[in-house]
């Protein structure tokens, strides 16, 4: 059962609902949103008198297994990263090198991606690599470099966290925590990120269904963190021509099933620099709320994923195209009701 409370609901109403759940030995999870509203997910049904208190605005008895992530009880969520809003109607571009290579190199990249149109800086301080011999990142030193780049450019920072024990330290430096595809079902990490005050970027696993992806988000939400952004980053397929297959079907479907913002990673999703721009535009056309793109001043010299990394000039071109597609879609939404003879 999902119970939605209005922003002005009395504190006593929440207490009554939780007490009713406890009396029936039902587990209840409360998720508070920045606007003051709240959602309570209960593992069972409550009696009618527990749901008639002031401020109860909606009750759902039938719902998806991902109670808190489900769209049924809430409109589009907007997640704030620094001063940037994801899901607020304007596509957001996160960009930067795959891995932090050094302070000066990162600041150069940060300045370049900001000039190109990015509003959030990405960069890995801790890198999960397929080979144990590959560069694993600079660790806390890399986090310090990211914080320095934020100070210089004003861009908020998103970076990956690999283990539950790293969450607090990474949260000290970063504005947003990223949970990568390999860790999508690392449940201790999901729970720990759910207890953080930082927003979380949750990438879809290589072989995960959309429902499994949303259930992973539910782990974070169930711990009290409402600020989750989903990221489609490509799934495994049979064609060796691509590193992964970017599953753009998942974008409108995830937005249909969930209120959480959805962004797309066309860099990992294709593995090919030449396809990043085209798939970025396609992602926005499919309804994505933003993009996360690997960009480097000199991709050929990048320490990680150079073959899928673009230049700042290419990023600027992508940002222009993304804006054009967004404007076209907004115009289409305005004229569609008129063409159909409906009231606007």
Language model segments and positions:
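Catalytic beta/alpha-barrel core
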Residues: 6, 138, 154-165, 175-188, ...
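Active-site mouth loops of central-metabolism enzymes
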Residues: 91-108, 131-136, 156-160, 180-181, ...
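Alpha-helix-loop-beta-strand connector modules within alpha/beta enzyme cores
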Residues: 135-159, 192-199, 248-263, 308-331
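Hydrophobic faces of well-ordered beta-strands that scaffold small-molecule active sites
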Residues: 92-97, 119-123, 157-160, 175-179, ...
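N-terminal small/glycine-rich loop or linker at the start of catalytic domains
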Residues: 80-98, 125-132, 255-264
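Catalytic alpha/beta core domains of metabolic enzymes, predominantly
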Residues: 81, 191, 196-295
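Non-catalytic terminal accessory/regulatory regions of metabolic enzymes
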Residues: 1-93
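Glycine-rich, proline-tolerant flexible connector loops at the mouths of alpha/beta enzymes
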Residues: 122-140, 297-309
